[in-house]
């Protein structure tokens, strides 16, 4: 199977997982990126089964609206049963690296609100130790150099993501060469640097379920 076919399979599996638990009042949190886009397209086939969605990015909001799915501001929603999103990496404990698409801050906020965070990914994203994929850090623009120096002290090699401005008006530093053996601690350390909005480690609030697309079919993983 191609990578896109694996993504389509896990996207459909996520829809199949949440659909029996949705009703006309349900609002679904939706992530950002290529795998999340497949989820949106699959979810749209059942748009009368739920009320609407909260989007983690402007791009996701546009895709949802294009399918005729109502998009709500998070502040107007009292609870989210599910948040469905992809990942750049996951370990066996369902700690994630996210933010390749630069939407990490809003993704992390929506994930924090959701009762159940379902991560959808192809098998290549499951790794023994996080860090081969560069860790994105969203930074207030004027603090970029300061934050980069602090990230070097933590053992990383930060690279400014040229030409990228987040939906929040900030910039991204991608941190290479990190061996992330304690993701909860590192997430906290990086977030404590003045000028950091947040980083792409989802460890304080990891995924609850990982739907993993493999050649043998979709596997359901819970945190070890």
UniProtKB/Swiss-Prot annotation:
It catalyses: aldehydo-D-ribose 5-phosphate = D-ribulose 5-phosphate. The keyword Isomerase applies. Pathway: Carbohydrate degradation; pentose phosphate pathway; D-ribose 5-phosphate from D-ribulose 5-phosphate (non-oxidative stage): step 1/1. The keyword Isomerase applies. Its EC number is 5.3.1.6. GO terms for cellular component: cytosol. Belongs to the ribose 5-phosphate isomerase family. This is Ribose-5-phosphate isomerase A. The gene is rpiA.
């Amino acid at each position: 199977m191609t990578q896109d076919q694996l993504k389509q399979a896990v996207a459909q599996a996520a829809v199949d997982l949440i659909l029996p638990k949705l009703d006309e009042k349900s609002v679904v949190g939706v992530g950002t990126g290529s795998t999340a886009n497949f989820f949106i397209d699959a979810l749209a086939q059942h748009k009368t089964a739920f009320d609407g969605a909260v989007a983690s990015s402007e791009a996701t909001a546009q895709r949802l609206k294009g399918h005729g799915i109502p998009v709500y501001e998070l502040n107007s929603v009292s609870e989210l049963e599910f948040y469905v999103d992809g990942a750049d990496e996951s370990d066996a404990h369902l700690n994630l690296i996210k933010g390749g698409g630069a939407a990490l801050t809003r993704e992390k906020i929506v994930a924090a609100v959701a009762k159940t965070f379902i991560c959808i990914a192809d098998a290549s994203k499951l790794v023994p130790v996080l860090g081969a994929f560069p860790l994105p850090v969203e930074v207030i623009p004027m603090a970029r150099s300061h934050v980069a120096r602090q990230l070097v002290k933590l053992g990383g090699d930060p690279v400014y993501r040229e030409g990228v401005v987040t939906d929040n008006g900030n910039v991204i530093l991608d941190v290479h060469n990190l061996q992330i053996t304690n993701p909860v601690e590192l997430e906290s350390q990086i977030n404590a640097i003045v000028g950091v909005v947040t980083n792409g480690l989802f460890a304080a609030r990891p995924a609850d379920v990982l739907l993993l697309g493999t050649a043998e079919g979709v596997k359901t993983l819970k945190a070890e």
